[in-house]
Amino acid sequence: MKVSCRAYVEITDPEDLLTLDFDSLPQPVFVMGGGSNLLFTKDFPGTVLHMGNQGIRFLDSASGSARNDKNTVVSTKADGSASVISTKAEGRVEKSVRVEAGVVFDDFCAWAAEQGLWGPENLSLIPGEVGASAVQNIGAYGVEAKDIIDTVHAFDRITRTFVDIPGADCGYGYRASLFKTDWKGRYIITAVTFRLSAVPRPRLDYGGVRKALEARFLDFASGSARNDKNTVISTKADGSASVISTKADGSASVISTKVEDRVEKSVTPQMIRETVIGIRREKLPDPEEIGSAGSFFCNPVIERDHFEKIVAIAKAENGPEYEVPHYDVGERVKVPAAWMIDQCGFKGMKLGGAQVYPKQPLVIVNATGEATPDEIIALEQRVIGTIRDKYGIELHPEVEHV
């Protein structure tokens, strides 16, 4: 959308924040990451500040303590860089990686997967930058940024000092943090230290990731078998498959049993990343072609008795065997906002240049490239009002309105 600001400041060296005269800038000053989760409702009267600092590195500041810790190894590479590998009591091997705020988050995901490190692979292809990921607590496919954030590094505009804030102190919740509430406007995030694992920690039981991986493994096995006249693929009624190899002497051996066993034992961060990217590209618009802010609404978490009322409505409309998609969150229930929006007939609906995306109704897109902020907001409010009237649920936008 065509919106403007009075002034724009690009910071590539965080040290420049110490000498920046904030009071001389057009007010207010708004810190923006990649802008992928923002809806500017009109021209911005103040200054947009963007942290453009780049870099990903293993932390080596723990070298001193590492030498005194028999459970820690410091590995120095030929180029002089160092990584600290700390083996905890439970046997996990972790690496601390500092990523500068201006790094595109998916570039960080790609880097981690290339290194064979576990943690951000399920978050692949989420648009935006690393600094903003710590504000929004981005999440997808069963993983949230808070799960891997160790420390948030920031500039405190009040004290004019650089601070290191433990992730545990950031008040993280579902798409929430203190950076969005009590600390809003105070801190400018300059970098984030992530805690990644060098040993397998796959999270597959969300959003079809496991099913897609199993299909991928079965396709690979089938392809190999088709090129080997001595190999047979046996698929059972329960969906499990065996790859049976017949040797020249006539004996047979089972190479693999259930596909899900192969997935658990052989999956890599890169495989999960590629699978997640494939799923996202199937249902989400390409930002190079259609403008959007990604998921527009948060998925509501409601009381169980309220959920039962929604189930009753759904069964009345779709039949007694119909099952409402949901996820248990302790004693409460998370209901996909996309499902409710679809059930209310909004999928593909247009209002001016704004549209509820046909493939994923959780997304509102600038379908024509000429949508105005007013059209986006009008469509948003129509969705919210209809969901409220039908299900008694107040949807809240995930997108920040500026």
Cite the ranges covered by each PLM segment.
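Generic detector of N-terminal low-structure segments
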Residues: 60, 219-222
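Residue-level signal for inorganic ion chemistry
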Residues: 13, 35, 128, 160, ...
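A cross-taxon signal for low-complexity, glycine/charged-rich
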Residues: 64-70, 74, 79-95, 225-226, ...
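Phosphate/pyrophosphate- and phosphate-bearing ligand-binding catalytic cores of soluble enzymes
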Residues: 38, 163-219, 236, 247, ...
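Beta-rich strand-turn-strand
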Residues: 117, 373-376
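Anion-binding (especially nucleotide phosphate/pyrophosphate-binding) glycine-rich loop
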Residues: 1-159
